[in-house]
A protein has these predicted regions:
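Condensing-enzyme catalytic core mediating Claisen C-C bond formation in acyl metabolism
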Residues: 1-23, 140-219, 325
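A glycine-/small-polar-enriched, mobile loop at the entrance of the PLP active site in fold-type I
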Residues: 14-24, 53-55, 274-279
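Claisen-condensing/thiolase-fold acyl-transfer catalytic domains that form or cleave C-C bonds
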Residues: 27, 31-34, 38, 57-58, ...
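Membrane helical hairpin/interfacial module
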Residues: 45-57
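Conserved beta-strand elements of the Class I
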Residues: 49-52, 110, 247, 308
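Active-site-adjacent elements of ketosynthase-type condensing enzymes
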Residues: 58-68, 116-144, 150, 180-200, ...
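Conserved beta-strand-centric core segments of catalytic alpha/beta enzyme folds
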Residues: 94-184, 291-325
């Protein structure tokens, strides 16, 4: 496509991305992340009594991918709920998990988030994209990718998994949560072609690229900065604290410019709102979990730290969560 490494880095902060192998679905990637999370938590898979699975790129139209993860983990029969808040899935999943645990319906919840974006990208020659071969692509393919450059340079594939457990530790866990959904701005980023309204089996629609994400980048950036800043302030106000009392703000990794603008709005230094988008791109539902895992293993999160999770995704959905680790 007509772009350059400099153009991509300047506008997104992305230096590299990773793509799943052909035929590798979110069930497989999610199960691998889940295995690591289970080992890290020091639990047995049989202790899991509920699964939440977030993706916008499921293995199949139906069933959802949650039961597929359970099967791979050897715990078929555990209830699995797939959620669809796209890039905003983490704070929504945290709210659902907290409710299940508080009600006594579950004690150990596995939350898996995974997305693979091959079907959402304007590339036809994936061997070239993955670097398996070097060859000139047809002019038509070059122009098609360039026309969808706004989304083609952003998304990467990835999976994350988190174990949520009941605790008796005073003041630990989810403290405050603020969630919003606004269908009036669904057109900021969406895929027109789907199922009931614009059938996925219509060849004319497919030829028009209606199966690819359509994004109003400027509108989305402004909405993200405004919503995330407002939501962060809302949960802090509810808790009676200011930004200086939050140890880390862990935000969805959509675009470095968004997170920089949120940091400026909240008067945060860069280290208070860490980023890994340069290494992975936007892995949609998986970004917060991946960043959380890295921060933990780097020793940047300790027991008792106060975290603020922030995310906005297609819908529009947005959420902020104050969480005592």
């Amino acid at each position: 496509m007509d772009t350059s490494d400099e153009w991509i880095r300047k506008r997104t902060g992305i230096h590299q991305r990773h793509f799943a192998e052909d035929g590798q679905g979110v069930g497989e990637l999610g199960a691998r992340a889940a295995e690591r999370a289970i080992e890290d938590a020091g639990i047995d898979p049989t202790e899991i009594d509920f699964i939440l699975f977030a993706t916008m790129t499921p293995d199949h139209l139906f069933p959802g991918s949650g039961p597929l993860v359970a099967e791979r983990l050897g715990i078929s029969g555990v209830p699995a709920l797939d959620i669809r808040q796209q890039c905003a899935s983490f704070p929504f999943a945290l709210e659902v998990a907290n409710g299940l645990i508080a009600s006594g319906a579950a004690r150990t919840i596995l939350f898996v988030a995974a997305d693979t974006h091959a079907s959402l990208m304007p590339f036809r020659d994936w061997d070239v994209v993955r670097g398996n071969v070097s060859r000139t692509i047809p002019r038509e393919d070059f122009e098609r990718a360039t026309a969808h450059r706004g989304i083609a340079v952003i998304f990467g594939d990835g999976a994350s998994a988190v174990i949520f457990r009941a605790t008796d530790r005073e003041g630990a866990g989810l403290l405050r949560s603020e969630l919003r959904s606004d269908g009036g701005r669904a057109d900021h980023i969406f895929i027109p072609m789907g199922f009931s309204r614009l059938p996925f089996n219509d060849p004319e629609l497919a030829a028009s690229d209606a199966h690819l994400p359509q994004m109003k980048g400027g509108n989305l950036l402004k909405a993200a900065v405004r919503e995330l800043s407002e939501l962060a302030r809302a949960v802090m106000e509810q808790e009676g604290i200011g930004p200086e009392e939050v140890d880390l703000f862990i935000a969805h990794q959509a675009n470095q410019r968004i997170n920089d603008a949120v940091a400026a709005a909240l008067k945060l230094s860069p280290e208070r709102i860490p980023s890994n988008i340069a290494r992975y791109g936007n892995t949609s539902s998986a970004t917060i979990g991946i960043l959380l895992d890295e921060l933990r293993h780097e020793g940047r999160i300790q027991e008792g730290d106060l975290l603020c999770f922030l995310a906005l995704g297609a819908g529009l959905h947005a959420g902020a969560s104050l969480f005592r680790y």
